[in-house]
Amino acid sequence: MKVFEAKTLLSEATDRAKEYKELRTQMVNLRKALKGVADLSDSEFSGKGASNIKAFYHDHVGVADQWIDYIDMKIAFFNSIAGAAEDKGLSDAYIEESFLEHELANANKKSKSIMSEQKKAMKDILNDIDDILPLDLFSTETFKDELADANDKRKKTLEKLDALDEDLKTEYALSEPNEQFIKSDFQKLQEATGKGKNATPIHYNAKAYRESDIHKKKGDIEKRTEAYLKIKKEEAKEREIEKLKERLKNYDYADADEFYEMAKTIGYENLTAEQQRYFTQIENTRELEAGFKGVAVGLYDSGKDAVVGLWDMVTDPGGTVEAITGAMAHPIKTYEAISAAIEESYQKDMVNGDTYSRARWVSYAVGTVVTSIVGTKGVGAVSKTGTAAKVTTKVKTAASKSATAQKAITVSKQTVDHIKQKVNTGIEVSKKHVKTKLNQIGDLTLADILPYHPRHDLVPAGVPYNAVNGVTLKEGLQKFAKVILPKPYGTSSSGRRTPAPHVPPVTVKYGEHFARWSRKKVLKPNIIYKTKEGYTYTTDNYGRITSVKADLQLGEAKRNQYAQTNAGKPQDRKPDDDGGHLIATQFKGSGQFDNIVPMNSQINRSGGKWYEMEQEWAKALSKKPPKKVAVQIEPVYSGDSLRPSYFDVTYKIGSRKEISVSIKNQPGG
C-alpha cells in the first residue's frame, strides 16, 4: 500500500535535482577537456596515429553530449514534480492509501448503518406516541449528502494519488532509452578502439563506430530528448503564468516594475482589459523614457516648427512617432478606426450630449483642425497652407456675436510662437511630469488615444458650440484623418525598414495587410491577417511574420517566383537560401511575401528537416478519411534581420500527442 507524504517527496526531488546539476557541471568540464584534445591543430599534434586519437576524443565529446542531455531530462523531471503534485491538489498532502481504501471506506458504510438503525428506532418510538402527539420523522437527506460528498472526496483523492504515481513513474521511464543507448553506443566506441593489446586510441576506427547500427539511432534519441525538454519548459512556463495570473487578480498596482515583469511573463493576450491598459501605459512610458533625450534633440535639430508635445508621444504614438520616424507606428490608426471613433464621439458628445459636452467637443475639434493636429503635422505646415486662417475665419464669422469666442480661436503669430516655445520647453520637461500624465489617463476608450483627442495646453477653448456646424466639423476631422494616414516607412542605418513601436497587434482584412516601402511590397507591422483557408498570421513591429496557425488543407496554390527569389534581399538572404513557404503550396499556402521567408535550402528541399516534416503532414492528410493536422509555426529572428534564426514548430496529427520541434535555419537544421 502506498503512503504519500508531499513534504518528503518534494524535498527529495529538490535534492536530486541539485545533485544532477552538480553532475552536469562536472560533465560539461569533462566535455570541454575532451574537446580540447579533439580540436588540436596539426601544428600542435600530428604524426602517426594522431588523426585516430583526435577522432577518438571527438567521438567521446558526442558521448558526453548524450550524458548531458540525459542529465537535463532528469533535472527537468525532478523540477516538475512539485508542479505535478500541485496540479493534482496534493502539494501539501499526507495520504495513507490503506486508510482511504479500508478504514475510511468501512467508516462510511458503518455511518450509513448507524444512521439507518437510529432512524428506524426513532420511527418506532414516534409510531408508539402517534395517537398522543403526532411528530414527523427527522430527515436524513443532509446527512446523506454530506456523507456522499466525503466519500466522493475519498475516491477522488485515491484517483489523484494513483494518477500522480502512474504519471511520475511513466515520465521517469522516458529517460531509460537514453541511458540504454548511451551504454550501448559507448560499448561500440570501445570496440572500435581495438581488442587486447591493440585497444588504444591510436588504433581507433572512427568509421566502424560511426556506421554502427546503434550509433545511427543517435538522431532519433536526440529528437525525443529535445521534444521532452521543450514540453517540460512549456509546462513550467504555463504553471508560472497561472500563478502570476492568480497573483494579479488582487494586485494593487503599487509596484509598476513588478507588475510589468509579471505581465510580460503572462503575455499581453492573457491579461484582463484593465491589466492590458495598465501594461500599455507602463510600456509606453518606458519607451518614452528610453528615447526621451534623442527624440527631443532630433526634433530641435530638424527645426523648431516641428511641433510635437510629449503628451502626444504617449496618447498618440501613431501620429507623433510617425512624424519622428516616418513609420506607420500604430496599428489602430487606420482611417476606418479613426472615422468610426470620430462618429462615435460626435454622436455621444454633440447629438446626445449636454451643454458642457457639446462645447467641449467643438472646442477640441476646432483646435485640432486649426492646428492640423498639433504634434502630427506641425504649426509650420499649417501656416504655409493657410488652413488655420481659413478655419479661423469661418468660425469667427459664425461666432461674430461673441468677442470672447473670437479671441479664443484666433491663431495668431503670438499663438504660433507660443506653441513653438512649448516645444523647446517640452525638451526640458522631466520624466516625472510624463509619468504624472500617464497616471491621469484613467479609463481609456478608442477615442481617447486617437489624433483628435484634446491637447489641453495646445488647443483653443471657449468656442460656442451653437455657432459651429458640427456635422461639417466632424466630416472635416474624418477627411483630415484620411489625409494624414498614408506615410512611408523610414529606412534604418542598416538599410532595413525602421520598426514601429511595440504595440498589441490588430486584425486586418486579408488584402489590407500589405504596405509600400521603398517601392516594395511589405507586410504591415503589428497586425493579424487570415487567408481564405483560415490560416492566421501575426507580424511584429518590424513587419516580420512571427506566428502562423493553421489546420492544414491538402491542395495546390500558385507559386510566385519573384517573391521566392527576392525574400530577404538585399541584406538578409544568404547565398544558399530559398524563398521558403511557411505553409507549403501543397497545403494551399500563399505564394506571396505574406507566407515566405529566407530559408536554408538544405532544410527546405528534399531530405531536409523542413521538407520531411511537410511530407509527414501531407501523408496524414492523404489518408482516407484524412487526419486533422493542426500546426503552429513561429519564426524567431535576431535583431532587425528579416531572416529567421530558427523555427519553433508545434503540430498535432489526429489524436496523436502534440509534437514540438525547433529547426535551425542552417544546413542540417
Swiss-Prot record:
Keyword Cell membrane: yes
GO MF annotation list: DNA binding; nuclease activity; toxin activity
Entries under PROSITE patterns matching the protein: LXG
Coiled-coil features, chain-numbered ranges: 2-39, 100-171, 226-258
Knockout mutant characteristics: Deletion of the yeeF-yezG operon has no visible growth phenotype, however it is out-competed by wild-type cells.
Segments forming domain LXG: 1-235
Composition-biased stretches (Basic and acidic residues): 570-580
Location in the cell: Cell membrane; Membrane raft
One GO cellular component, as annotated: membrane raft
UniProt KW keywords: Cell membrane, Coiled coil, DNA-binding, Hydrolase, Membrane, Nuclease, Toxin
Induction field: Expressed on rich and minimal solid media likely in early stationary phase; dependent on DegSU. Not expressed in liquid LB, but only under conditions that promote biofilm formation.
InterPro entries: Bact_secretion_toxin, DNA/RNA_non-sp_Endonuclease_sf, Endonuclea_NS_2, LXG_dom
Subcellular location, principal: membrane
Domain of life per record: Bacteria
UniProt-annotated stretches for the region Disordered: 561-580
Biological function: Toxic component of one of 6 LXG toxin-immunity modules in this strain. They promote kin selection, mediate competition in biofilms, and drive spatial segregation of different strains, indicating that LXG toxins may help avoid warfare between strains in biofilms. Mediates intercellular competition during biofilm formation; disruption of the operon disadvantages the bacteria, but overexpression of the cognate immunity protein restores growth in competition with wild-type.
Similarity annotation: In the N-terminal section; belongs to the LXG family.
Quaternary structure and partners: Interacts with cognate immunity protein YezG but not with non-cognate immunity protein YobK. The interaction probably inhibits the toxic activity of YeeF.
Stated name of the protein: Toxin YeeF
Source species of the chain: Bacillus subtilis (strain 168)
